[in-house]
Amino acid sequence: MPKKVVTLGEIMLRLSTPDYKRFVQADTFDVTYGGGEANVAAAICNYGENGTFVTKVPNNPIGQSAINHLRRYGVDTQYIARGGDRLGIYFLETGASMRASQVVYDRAGASIADVDISEFDFDKILEGADWFHTTGITPALSDKAAALTMAALKAAKAKGITTSIDLNYRKKLWSKEKAQQVMSELCQFVDVCIGNEEDADTTLGFK
């Protein structure tokens, strides 16, 4: 029987320049969707397991397009909440030769940042789950998103489900002090913590 892995996080609209063009050269963008936790759910499905993704997207065609993108990979999207104002966007300029890639984020006011715990029934979402995964990006989005992450981790631990988190510190989203305050609490409910030495130091104070 396939294993069930539940992931929680943000899915974003990615607009990338074609043919290695710079932002200032491009007059069109290629469109796709992605996010750390969403990508994990898709990868799980590619391995023949059950990947379930939990998030909140706007109740409009862009939100539906993001859901349709996930479904193409076989991701279970039935627990995605609808509402809020918008989907977060990031712009990608793919590097060439010695020129590095550049990313510009436009995610303020995204639906997942204005989420409410009452929109999700984690007892139902986690039923039959073998693993729960999230990242440090999700709680960094807002206090509401951090509370949702905590609720999910607590529910998973109460059910005896293995939990994991990728620290993935982003200084543009929150300060080192805020990250340590929130992540130290979240990691009390985490079995597997993923991160490099720098992220462990920044978010947990481990050297």
Regions of interest found by a model, annotated:
Residues 50-136:
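Conserved N-terminal subdomain of the carbohydrate kinase-like
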Residues 26-28, 53-54, 107-109, 139-140, ...:
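Short, contiguous strand/loop micro-motifs
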Residues 11, 84, 109, 169-171, ...:
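Glycine-rich beta-alpha junction loops
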Residues 137-207:
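Conserved beta-alpha-beta core of the PfkB/ribokinase-like small-molecule kinase fold
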Residues 7-8, 79, 105, 164-165, ...:
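General beta-strand structural signal in soluble alpha/beta enzymes
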Residues 1-76, 116:
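Glycine-rich phosphate/adenosyl-contacting loop at the front of the ribokinase-like
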